[in-house]
């Protein structure tokens, strides 16, 4: 099923509207770079600033551009269950291969509430693979391994989880509760290799928008058991992985992608541009990785 590098695409805007041409360019960059899948509408895509219709259109554009070459796994979670159900049904009907549903944010539900929330999503699309998106730093709550295990036993279409936390002990308990064949993806760029050494099958890393070949190769080496080769790539990618978080994601990501000519340097409020100091750090990082056009390097 799903494995390897599945880049979470940023949502490109131009004068406040979805820039479909830029989104298609991003798809081509990561697919031609060897990525094993594509995700749209996750944290990197600023979904909380978009209407459901905008999110649906982004899914349609990505599916059309990918054209079946790799799996597409949109983020379909929202705060309101009804919106999550609508967007998840839409993703399935549009032809996506699965969906990633974030732990509901802000309201800080208890574990029984989380179980019932994900159970309703799973019942609504019973033959559609679902990944739970565990991101306690944004959601304000973490879904417990026991809750995930319960969901996995009750709903076979809950096939995996994206883990966006530095807590590696969580993974050990997760595999014990949900099974060693549960599909875990790393959601923190610099922890891809550590998580894969514990049994994760890949990464959903924003860095792969900058360096798709390198991130895909790291995953391939780890999956093949070539941990020496994977370690070399881990250290090679470390600065880029850390740079994603020099400001709120996706601000650094979009800043560098704009210099690369792939999209406009534009976000939806309340996000805004980073500081000149961070921009200078990003410019030096991008130069070291060979990401900038020659004229930008000389500027």
From Swiss-Prot:
Keyword Cell cycle annotated: no
SMART domains: DHDPS
InterPro entries with a match to the protein in the record: Aldolase_TIM (IPR013785), DapA (IPR005263), DapA-like (IPR002220), HpaI_NOT_DapA (IPR012691), Schiff_base-form_aldolases_AS (IPR020625)
Pfam family, one: DHDPS
Key words, A-Z: Amino-acid biosynthesis, Cytoplasm, Diaminopimelate biosynthesis, Lyase, Lysine biosynthesis, Schiff base
Metabolic or biological pathway: Amino-acid biosynthesis; L-lysine biosynthesis via DAP pathway; (S)-tetrahydrodipicolinate from L-aspartate: step 3/4
Cell compartment(s), UniProt: Cytoplasm
Protein role: Catalyzes the condensation of (S)-aspartate-beta-semialdehyde [(S)-ASA] and pyruvate to 4-hydroxy-tetrahydrodipicolinate (HTPA).
Protein name: 4-hydroxy-tetrahydrodipicolinate synthase
Originating species: Thermus thermophilus (strain ATCC 27634 / DSM 579 / HB8)
Organismal lineage: Bacteria, Thermotogati, Deinococcota, Deinococci, Thermales
């Amino acid at each position: 099923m799903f494995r390897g590098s599945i880049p979470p695409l940023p949502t490109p805007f131009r004068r406040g509207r979805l820039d479909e041409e830029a989104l298609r360019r991003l798809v081509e960059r990561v697919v031609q770079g060897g990525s094993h899948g594509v995700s749209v509408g996750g944290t990197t895509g600023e979904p909380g600033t978009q209407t459901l219709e905008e999110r649906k259109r982004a899914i349609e554009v990505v599916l059309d551009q990918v054209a079946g070459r790799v799996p597409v796994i949109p983020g379909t979670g929202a705060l309101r269950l009804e919106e999550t159900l609508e967007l998840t049904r839409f993703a399935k009907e549009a032809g996506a291969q699965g969906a990633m549903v974030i732990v509901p944010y802000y309201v800080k539900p208890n574990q029984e509430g989380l179980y019932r929330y994900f159970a309703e999503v799973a019942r609504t699309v019973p033959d559609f693979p679902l990944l739970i998106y565990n991101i306690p730093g944004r959601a304000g709550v973490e879904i417990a391994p026991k809750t995930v295990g319960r969901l996995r036993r009750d709903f076979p279409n809950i096939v995996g989880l994206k883990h966006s936390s530095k807590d590696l002990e969580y993974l050990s308990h997760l595999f014990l509760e949900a099974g060693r064949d549960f599909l875990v993806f790393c959601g923190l760029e610099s922890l891809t290799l550590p998580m894969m050494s514990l049994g994760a099958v890949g990464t959903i890393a924003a860095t792969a928008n900058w360096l798709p070949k390198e991130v895909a190769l790291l995953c391939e080496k780890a999956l093949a058991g070539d941990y020496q080769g994977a370690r070399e790539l881990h250290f090679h990618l470390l600065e880029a992985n850390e740079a994603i978080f020099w400001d709120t994601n996706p601000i650094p990501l979009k800043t560098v992608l704009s210099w690369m000519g792939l999209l406009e340097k534009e976000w939806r409020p309340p996000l805004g541009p980073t500081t000149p100091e961070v921009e200078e750090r990003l410019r030096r990082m991008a130069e070291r990785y060979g990401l900038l056009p020659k004229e930008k390097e000389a500027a």
